[in-house]
Amino acid sequence: MTIKREMRNDKRAVPKAPINENISAREVRLIGADGEQVGIVSIDEALRIADEAKLDLVEISADAVPPVCKVMDYGKHLFEKKKQANEAKKNQKQIQIKEIKFRPGTEDGDYQVKLRNLVRFLTDGDKAKISLRFRGREMAHQELGMELLKRVEADLAEYGTVEQHPKMEGRQLMMVIAPKKKK
């Protein structure tokens, strides 16, 4: 006994256009195999032309009146479309936001390490979110936090630009720096 398995839903699949006998229109605007426009012909005539060329009749635009069909190799057409979709996906880069946390009393050694990480994030093309958390009585000296963020902004001026200026959110001071565009 064989078990019928359902085909998985492939997100990369190109939507299939009606071809050959599956085209429901009576007459179509035909484009030949070499790209020249043949004109408006009956579906039987278009199928005969495609059959003579040993190619498929593919419906390109169903919304047009009459629908536009082209004589082409459908398998090759699907392959090219899938290839283009993969290329577009490969060339896409997703920008992430990386966060570094400071404190008002961050010492110079720790500051340098965190600054190196921020430089690495920005050169990799990611945005950097700098958060400075105040505890207890430190809230009374928010100007120390502002000075620290101004120092960070000055040190990172050659690597990025401030996208969101320092802003208080509860007990945290936040700032977002975006990488500079590469030429």
Swiss-Prot record:
Annotated protein name in UniProt: Translation initiation factor IF-3
Source organism superkingdom: Bacteria
Single biological process term from Gene Ontology: ribosome disassembly
GO molecular function: ribosome binding; translation initiation factor activity
Gene behind the chain: infC
UniProt subunit comment: Monomer.
Family label: Belongs to the IF-3 family.
Keywords: Cytoplasm, Initiation factor, Protein biosynthesis
GO cellular component: cytosol; membrane
Keyword Cytoplasm: yes
Entry's localization field: Cytoplasm
Biological source species: Pseudomonas putida (strain ATCC 47054 / DSM 6125 / CFBP 8728 / NCIMB 11950 / KT2440)
